[in-house]
Amino acid sequence: MSAHEHLGIEQLHSWLVHAHAACVRHGELLNTLNEFPVADSDTGANVTHTLAGAARALTQADVIDFADAATVASAGAVLGARGNSGMILAQCLLAFSESAQNAPSQGLRPVELVAALQAMARGAVKAVSHPVEGTFISAMRSAAQAGADTLDTSPRPTLEEITATAAFGAQEAVVETVGIGHGPVDAGAGAIMLIMTALADVFNPQGDLTGTALNMLTDLSQNNTSHKQVSGRSGEFEVMYLWNATAFQAERLRKALGEIGDSVAVGGAVDSLNMGLFHVHVHTDSPRAALPPYGKARQICIRRLRSSRPEPATNPYGFNARGGSNVIPLERFSSKRPAKAARKVQNEIGVIACTRAPGLIVPLARAGAVVVLEPDSDAIVRAAGDIQNPNAFVLPCDEASISAAHAASRSLTSRAAVWALDDSNLGEDILVAGDYISKSAGGVEALTRLKVADTSNEVAMFVTAMALGLAELENSSDLDEAAKLALMERTAWVTAVRMRVLEFSGVDAEHIALAVANALGEWTVTVTVLVGALVDSDVAPLIRDAVGQKAQDMGIDEDLDVNIYASHQDLDQ
């Protein structure tokens, strides 16, 4: 007789913990394998975040039965999900939870476990707009089919048998990804293999299928060659947010996002009123168009994935003070900013730019910042997780976001010692530190440290983000982490000291243009103008002409750059 009659609450928790621990230990391996649908090197991190959200939620909850535990874990996965792979995994766990609602209170027996695995496979397909073979989806389907075959053929199927064959099914799918077109090993398929072997090890720890799977992944990756992107239209930006909506609205949004981008995932669970919290993810060239047309989104984070075209982007108003060129200085460097595959955490300093101006999303992201639109503390914490760097500058845009940034910093610090897990099977301590997950051989490594800059308005935030982006680009390979951090701290300070911010309101466009021109000084090198949504369209050309003439009169026109942006924000609010 099997030692386990049910996959109960304890086993569910152990599964999530073991899977999370495996991904923490070998997330970098998954990251280096990540090329589909875009080489943003984050599958390992995204899956780890999602598993951490599920395990943390279950650890902290007081559940009454298995169905309740599965619901809590899946909800935590949705909130913790990052990226396309995290979204797919969260949708799988939601499907697992929905299947578990009809199970006995003690947990899943073999027949219910197979049904749950099959539901997860369907959930993986449902999570994406354009399912692709040889990826996350294939591995989950193969695992579910192997479990179902065991249920059909074994005279007395046990949980040990079903979980072991499901793990072997996932392993077979990983091997079959070789040569499909996106590299010898797909990172998403590899992640599912680790998750399924972790489940098998819960019921048979001596088997150590996870260790075998890790060795197999390592061996297969040794001959890893340059991957070919399967989809030819992966967007320049990744957009993620949480959104309260009905199932019908979510489906409409999914279809709309499919028209403007790919890697679309809209996942969530609805209640009896057909309302739910959905996690939205898309890769697109038009991040503003990816925002929902109705309802309120929160935790809106946007980051740049790659350059979609070699030529630099143009000024939103089509000019600068020099007349002949449409290119603004920041775009000259940001358009040449290389896509960074397999980014090393220790060599990067993250920048989180807070804004309430949708028109600034693209230039900020192209400067290398993770952009948080309509910031609050939860959104900033999420952005810190997306950065995956031990240090990050937060650039607030107003007094409210300054408070939110400090609250986020306190939140990350307080989470550092909340939940340390001893995974005896893997032999090391694992820490889930808020949304930045790290490990070290001797215990715990530092979580993301947030440094809040003194930027109290949109212009100060924007100019500082430009300066930090340029400093990071010019010194990306010459300095170690400590030196780079010191450089960027000084850059932010010098920028703040040398910056003069003017705010204008009213209907007299000529008066505003002259006021901007009269603010020029002998040492002025850059003028950045943010034009609000309610400002007349003739203000921008008037400012250009007035500043250009004044600069010429002062003899500084050859060294002066004027950048004018339509912020699409009511700056009077």
Question: What do these predicted ranges mean?
Answer:
Residues M1-Q573:
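N-terminal loops that bind phosphate or other acidic moieties
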